[in-house]
Design a protein with these regions (language model features):
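Structural signature of tandem-repeat unit edges
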Residues: 1-59, 69-84, 93-96, 100-123, ...
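Predominantly extracellular beta-rich ligand-binding scaffolds that present long acidic/polar faces
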Residues: 89-90
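Short alpha-helical DNA-recognition segment
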Residues: 62
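Conserved, function-critical positions that sit in or immediately flank catalytic
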Residues: 180
Length: 251
């Protein structure tokens, strides 16, 4: 599927933005590649109806997401002119919605001349490599080690990933607020012992002092879990089909 740019579109990001309607894209069931033609600078993925649009009155955001599940897109090619996503109220299409919209996505190509993003081993980073922006939903490989240069992980970077079983967080990462929602095969989160902000024990993610439980992997196969006595708060309620018993300390 090739997406063309807008002719005489104006000089603002909003006017130049090319919107991909996920419900319409789902009609191309056999398409494997989504390509943005030369001239496409700003992109948005429409994942919910417009407010006040009478044509969309009976359509919900959930309908758009159901359509996204039908897409077979495995690769997205952004044009050499691509600048960045347009931050519409549908959400940032790269930093928030990419995996949600494209569950079979394995590869993304972004020009080396792009000022905001780069792709390394099929993972999207900020241009300087200090922020991991998005780990693609269907990227092959069961394990991944975050590069030492990385300082930050985007909140949605590991949501809706389907093959990843273990991830290792490097010593310089400082992000505590990261979602691993719907990472159904993830069994283990490891953290470098040199990390000053995060820690892990038995594959579970905590803050360094282990006073806050940050993430219990969705694919961890233990049938029971005893929360450490040091834990005072939980940022995340375990969503795990294998767990039958959860032991909570008195305090």
């Amino acid at each position: 599927v090739v997406i063309e740019g807008k002719a005489n579109s104006g000089n603002t990001e909003e006017l130049q933005c090319v919107t991909v309607d996920m419900r319409k894209l789902a009609q191309f069931k056999n398409a494997k590649v989504l390509k943005f033609a030369k001239g496409v600078k700003y992109v948005a993925f429409k994942t919910k109806p417009d407010t006040g649009d009478k044509l969309d009155d009976k359509i919900t955001g959930q309908d758009y997401l159901k359509s996204a599940d039908k897409t077979g897109i495995e690769k997205i090619e952004f044009s050499s002119d691509f600048v960045k996503p347009y931050s519409h109220d549908w959400g940032n299409c790269i930093e928030e919605k990419l995996n949600q919209c494209f569950p079979k996505l394995k590869k993304v190509s972004i020009s080396k001349n792009n000022k905001y993003y780069k792709v390394s081993n099929d993972v999207i980073f900020s241009k300087d490599g200090k922020k991991l922006v998005m780990y693609l939903a269907n990227r092959p490989g069961k394990s991944y080690k975050i590069p030492a240069k990385c300082r930050k992980i985007g909140y949605y970077a590991f949501e809706n990933v389907h093959n990843l079983k273990s991830v290792t967080i490097s010593k310089n990462v400082k992000s505590k607020n990261v979602s691993f929602a719907n990472a159904e095969k993830l069994e283990k989160i490891s953290v470098s012992k040199k990390n000053k902000v995060l820690a892990s024990k038995n594959g579970v993610l905590y803050n360094k002092k282990m006073t806050t439980l940050l993430e219990y992997p969705m694919g961890k196969k233990n049938t029971s879990f005893r929360i450490p006595k040091t834990v005072k708060t939980m940022d995340y309620v375990p969503d795990n089909i294998f767990m039958k018993k959860l032991y909570v300390p008195k305090k």
